[in-house]
């Protein structure tokens, strides 16, 4: 016991080491730092962001906007034409008339807010809203007349009801404990349907309940009842201890498969025939040992489509299950080396039974059309280095497919654009050609949408976009750049560099100090996240993303560049670059990017820092130890430092072989200043990864700082976390004065 106490005291002493800074005068303009933060700028941006309230099934929507004085104005927009009109041409007249009619004085012209705004019958002439005392009123925009009404059946403040499960006219299914029971309303008989249920494989959604009210999982297909359930039997446990639980610390244990464990979670399908009383697992669903299954149940078709994926994700099959017989048929098999695209892979079904299937067989993702039996008919989408992404809309009557895509051979390949192509594979065209990122929100009709166009250096522009015809986008509103700049916003620099191979272009964002002294050279901090499932480089407009602009205004440059292997949107080879080198693949690219930036900006290459969260924390530690003479200060948060004890599919797919290299092995090579921080209740990346790294550093005699958020989970984002990061870099990399360090807030 004494040895463990010694280790704990040693780690605590490291975290409480007194600050050693030169007594200099304050050198940071903290007002500039404050004015560049998201919390300062968000109240200026948010009121100008349209939230479309679509009117029925029409192509018209309503939204409101606030000016700098907080005055709210309501508009109606015809998305087919882009034409915008005022909902209330004279708000003052509207308010006076309403007060006269209702006696309700709570409605104010200066801060006009129409609660529960609702347009009746999908028309714009009449709308209803809620006044004081939960009273509702209807207003006729044509006559200017008010009427008192009951609460409208629907409003914009209410969500659509969830789909209810199909009921059987004769049989009712109940759950008790982990199993299911069937009651025959004709005979009154109650019989047990399943017997295999247990805590790790429950047929009900309330596994701990022991009453008949427990909710069953399945649905009826005629007289056949199908149940999809998770089988976690044999899967190993992960335990966390919450030290803040009262009156005693409490252990939280959950099942968590690790890479190359024998037992993995399995999706199973149970089939029960009420006519015969026979039931059992449909074993054909689980063809791949340790793989995964995704079911798409289609009660209207009397069949079940499902995909099953091999454990290493190098094979994906689309299958059809005949519900009546329980037999399955393989329709499409996709075999990709080293693994499929886990983000974009998918399919859609047409009403005639044809299948739209996504494939990366050419190296770049595209959609293909198959008949209902799995015969390929044609490739639908195409383009040089174009990666087709999610499907936005399928108009089977018009024979068109609208989809998002990335790349295409020109410009920044990370910008999302929208395309349309015929289901005959012809006539593909780009609907949003601007060199910017786009986000499209479709109307319920699927014929028009609200389009947001932006970049990190371009505040949002709002347009309407019609999916039919060639009218293009119609601008109806935007965020004035001058308004944001006056409030303290600074446009970052969009950068393009080459990877360590000297050929592959990499893209990112460079945040600069508000004031640059031409006689000085500045430290640079690299904000990293390696992927592979995504990178965290912002493409659309964001305010002080990750706090990087306000950090830069403390007196440094901050760089965020996506390395090879960091994104599923640039083709198979780029995406799969991590395989076999999960620890090391992004390191050389990040170092090379910094060196290139230093050739065109006043960067002090002797003062390079690095930080990241999750995979970024993992990369931070690996970079600090791989290039110890280059990265001098690192801040690693919630890092998956040992991927051998992380979630199973991460290491199996993205690395591909057992014994995944860890940052723990690199601990003896640490020379710079390092902060490790983690949440004690992290149920995503087990904190054991960080604890094991800390122990390795202690054994290697390496000084470091360690901070534990006792009850935090994976996301550590908080004012205290931000203050901790700023203090660490301010002290060790920027060498700020004691007075400056005292300005850093932790709340």
Language model features with spans:
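Bacterial N-terminal signal peptides
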Residues: 10-20
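Beta-propeller folds
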Residues: 15, 25-439, 447-448, 456-460, ...
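Bacterial N-terminal signal peptides that target proteins for export
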Residues: 2-12
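Compositionally biased, intrinsically disordered low-complexity regions
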Residues: 15-17, 379, 530, 707
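Serine-hydrolase catalytic core recognition
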Residues: 52, 307, 437-747
């Amino acid at each position: 016991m004494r040895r463990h106490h010694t280790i704990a005291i040693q780690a605590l002493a490291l975290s409480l080491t007194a600050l050693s800074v030169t007594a200099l005068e304050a050198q940071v303009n903290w007002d500039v730092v404050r004015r560049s933060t998201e919390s300062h700028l968000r109240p200026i941006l948010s009121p100008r962001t349209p939230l479309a309230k679509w009117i029925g099934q029409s192509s018209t929507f309503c939204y409101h906007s606030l000016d700098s004085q907080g005055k709210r104005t309501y508009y109606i927009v015809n998305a087919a034409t882009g034409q915008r009109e005022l909902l209330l041409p004279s708000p003052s007249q509207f308010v006076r008339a309403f007060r006269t009619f209702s006696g309700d004085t709570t409605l104010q012209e200066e801060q006009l807010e129409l609660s529960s705004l609702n347009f009746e019958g999908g028309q714009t002439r009449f709308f209803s809203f809620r006044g004081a005392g939960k009273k509702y009123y209807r207003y006729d925009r044509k006559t200017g007349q008010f009427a008192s009404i009951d609460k409208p059946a629907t409003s914009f403040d209410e969500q659509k009801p969830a789909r209810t499960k199909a009921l059987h006219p004769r049989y009712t299914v109940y759950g008790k404990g982990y199993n299911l029971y069937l009651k025959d309303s004709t005979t009154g008989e109650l019989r047990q349907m399943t017997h295999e249920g247990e805590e790790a494989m429950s047929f009900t959604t309330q596994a701990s309940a022991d009453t008949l009210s427990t909710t069953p999982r399945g649905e009826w297909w005629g007289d056949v009842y199908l149940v999809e359930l998770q089988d976690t039997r044999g899967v190993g446990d992960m335990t966390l201890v919450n030290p803040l639980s009262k009156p005693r610390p409490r252990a939280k244990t959950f099942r968590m498969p690790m890479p190359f464990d024998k037992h993995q979670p399995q999706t199973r399908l149970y089939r029960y025939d009420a006519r015969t009383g026979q039931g059992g697992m449909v074993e054909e669903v689980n063809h791949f040992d340790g793989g995964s299954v995704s079911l798409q149940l289609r009660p209207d078709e009397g069949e079940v489509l499902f995909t099953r994926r091999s454990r290493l994700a190098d094979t994906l099959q689309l299958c059809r299950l005949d519900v009546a017989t329980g037999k399955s048929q393989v329709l499409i098999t996709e075999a990709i080396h080293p693994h499929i695209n886990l983000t974009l892979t998918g399919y859609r079904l047409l009403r005639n039974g044809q299948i739209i299937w996504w494939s990366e067989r050419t190296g770049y993702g595209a959609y293909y059309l198959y008949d209902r039996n799995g015969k390929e008919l044609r490739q639908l989408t195409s383009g040089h280095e174009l990666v087709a992404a999610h499907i936005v809309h399928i108009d089977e009557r018009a024979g068109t497919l609208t989809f998002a895509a990335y790349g295409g051979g020109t410009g920044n390949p990370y910008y999302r654009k929208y395309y349309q192509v015929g289901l005959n594979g012809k006539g593909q065209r780009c609907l949003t050609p601007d060199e910017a990122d786009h986000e499209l929100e479709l109307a319920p009709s699927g014929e028009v949408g609200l389009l947001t166009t932006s970049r990190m250096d371009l505040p949002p522009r709002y347009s309407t976009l019609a999916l039919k015809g060639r009218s293009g986008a119609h601008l109806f509103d935007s965020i004035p750049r001058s308004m944001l700049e006056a409030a303290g916003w600074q446009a970052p620099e969009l950068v393009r560099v080459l990877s360590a191979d000297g050929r592959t272009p990499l893209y990112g964002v460079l945040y600069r100090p508000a004031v640059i002294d031409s006689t000085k050279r500045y430290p640079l901090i690299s904000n990293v996240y390696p992927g592979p499932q995504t990178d965290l480089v912002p493409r659309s407009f964001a305010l002080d993303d990750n706090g990087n602009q306000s950090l830069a205004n403390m007196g440094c440059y901050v760089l965020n560049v996506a390395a090879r292997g960091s994104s599923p949107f640039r083709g198979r080879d780029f995406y799969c670059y991590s395989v076999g080198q999960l620890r090391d693949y992004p390191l050389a690219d990040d170092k090379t990017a910094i060196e290139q930036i230093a050739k065109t900006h006043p960067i002090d290459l002797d003062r390079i820092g690095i930080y990241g969260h999750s995979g970024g924390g993992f990369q931070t530690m690996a970079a600090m130890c791989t290039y110890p003479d280059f990265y001098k200060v690192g801040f690693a948060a919630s890092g998956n430092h040992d991927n051998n004890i992380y979630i199973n599919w991460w290491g199996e797919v993205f690395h591909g072989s057992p014994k995944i290299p860890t940052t723990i092995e690199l601990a003896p090579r640490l020379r710079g200043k390092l902060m490790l921080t983690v949440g004690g209740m992290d149920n995503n990346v087990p904190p054991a990864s960080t604890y094991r790294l800390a122990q390795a550093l202690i054994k290697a005699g390496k000084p470091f700082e360690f901070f534990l958020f006792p009850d935090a989970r994976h996301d550590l984002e908080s004012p205290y976390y931000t203050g901790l990061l700023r203090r660490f870099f301010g002290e060790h990399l920027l060498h700020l004065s004691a007075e400056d360090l005292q300005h850093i807030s932790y709340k």
